A protein has these predicted regions:
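Transmembrane beta-strands of outer-membrane beta-barrel proteins
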Residues: 55-57, 170, 176, 181-183
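Extracytoplasmic gating/loop element in the C-terminal half of outer-membrane beta-barrel translocons
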Residues: 137, 188-244
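C-terminal extracellular loops and terminal segments
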Residues: 32, 77, 81-91, 96-99, ...
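Flexible, solvent-exposed coil segments and beta strand-coil junctions
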Residues: 16-26, 146-153, 227-238
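Conserved small-residue
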Residues: 49-160, 225
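Extended hydrophobic-aromatic, low-complexity segments
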Residues: 10-15, 181-184, 192-195
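Outer-membrane beta-barrel proteins
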Residues: 29-37, 151, 156-163, 195
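Extracellular/periplasmic, surface-exposed regions of secreted and cell-surface proteins
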Residues: 1-94, 240-244
């Protein structure tokens, strides 16, 4: 069977959105938020038997699109979430986007040389000369998304979504006389994940065991870094203090 659906939810209970000028008191929860979901579901069932054997298969495929319609009178109001004690908030919910999309910096490769560092100094760093710039060669280079020639908080953007492009499920049962075997498979395709574990395994911020990725896939001076996905090994590196789409 094939089904299409549309659902709009109104007056969701959310924290009131207002200017920081109103103070730091707790925000009251009010019935104000609206969102809509559209999607399509596909179901296929097959049953048959032969002699002492019988089998039953059920396949389910689902695709949906979630969109926030309103969380405040102001179109640019946002709700933040998924925070970590390292990099702060991870997700942003705002009008025109899905709930809790990942929000941070886009990684645009690595600083390959001193000139690149001087042309676009790293986020939060005061690089005055070539000597200062040397310390940042081989580290992540964030994208200047607003095109103003410098890296700052305004360069954060939507970098991924936890919502899958496709949800698939398969139930399978095979029976022989009084014996039966049942299996269930579930999969999501196209959704992004925030991997907090990599803070510990792929970077130097914490002591402890590290992944082999640090050894094999880190940027190395003078090497072929076409397959590198992690920055040069440096325990003073601050790139992981910011939420990004780094591998």
């Amino acid at each position: 069977g094939l089904e299409w659906y549309y659902k709009k939810t109104t007056d969701m209970l959310i924290a009131a959105q207002y200017s920081a000028l109103a103070g730091e008191s707790s925000k009251p929860y009010i019935n104000f938020g609206d969102m809509k979901n559209t999607g399509v579901d596909f179901n296929f069932n097959y049953r048959d038997s032969k002699g002492d054997w019988s089998w039953d298969f059920s396949l389910n495929l689902s695709h949906y699109k979630n969109e926030v319609v309103k969380i405040s009178e102001a179109d640019d109001a946002s709700m933040w979430g998924g925070g970590t004690r390292i990099s702060g908030n991870v997700t942003r919910t705002t009008k025109g986007h899905a709930i809790s999309e990942f929000y941070g910096y886009k990684v645009n490769g690595f600083y390959e040389n001193v000139d690149e560092v001087l042309a676009l100094p790293p986020l939060g760093q005061d690089v005055k000369n070539a000597e200062d710039a040397k310390a940042w060669v081989g580290k992540f280079k964030f994208a200047d998304t607003d095109g103003n020639g410098k890296l700052d908080g305004n360069d954060r953007t939507f970098i991924g979504s936890p919502h899958p492009d496709l949800i698939a499920g398969l139930n399978a049962t095979v029976t022989w006389k009084n014996w039966d075997l049942t299996a269930f498979f579930y999969s999501t395709i196209g959704n992004d994940l925030f991997n907090n574990t990599k803070y510990f395994t792929d970077f130097w911020l914490f002591e402890g065991n590290k992944s082999s990725r640090m050894r094999d896939l880190s940027w190395k001076p003078g090497a072929d870094n076409s397959k590198a996905v992690l920055p040069v090994l440096d325990y003073l590196d601050t790139c992981l203090l910011y939420t990004s789409d780094a591998a």
